[in-house]
Amino acid sequence: MRRFVRSLSSTGRSQTGSLPVRGLRKLLRFYQLTFSSLVGTQCRHLPTCSAYMDEALARHGVWAGLFIGLARLSRCHPWGTAGYDPVPDQLDANVPRLQPWRHGRWRGPLEITWKPEHKDQNL
């Protein structure tokens, strides 16, 4: 028996079951098993770009997830960003539905909002 992992979008609807999401995720998996495994992992980010796109599609659906993934691909080049770059947990509510490209971060470094707290201030 198969187990299905359900992912919720910002609207609360499951996105992993829709036909376009499943189709795009299968294409990504095909890429990972064929071309990516032959060439090797070359991505500058963690998670890799294909894993990032897969998670963005599963979490946010085709409409926003595709643009979030494309924005990540546009940053993955020798002069682009590098390092840990997670998929956003939720979409910006102020972005109009007909402008999904505004969900993606197209350039610039990842903004770190968390700062470690030191208990000993004498460091």
Curated annotation (Swiss-Prot):
Record's GO cellular component terms: plasma membrane
Chief location category: membrane
Pfam families xref list: YidD
Keywords, sorted A to Z: Cell inner membrane, Cell membrane, Membrane
Compartment(s): Cell inner membrane
Record's bilayer topology term: Peripheral membrane protein
Matching InterPro entries: Membr_insert_effic_factor_YidD
Family, similarity comment: Belongs to the UPF0161 family.
The protein's role, per its UniProt record: Could be involved in insertion of integral membrane proteins into the membrane.
NCBIfam families recorded: membrane protein insertion efficiency factor YidD
Name of the protein in its database record: Putative membrane protein insertion efficiency factor
Organism of origin: Beijerinckia indica subsp. indica (strain ATCC 9039 / DSM 1715 / NCIMB 8712)
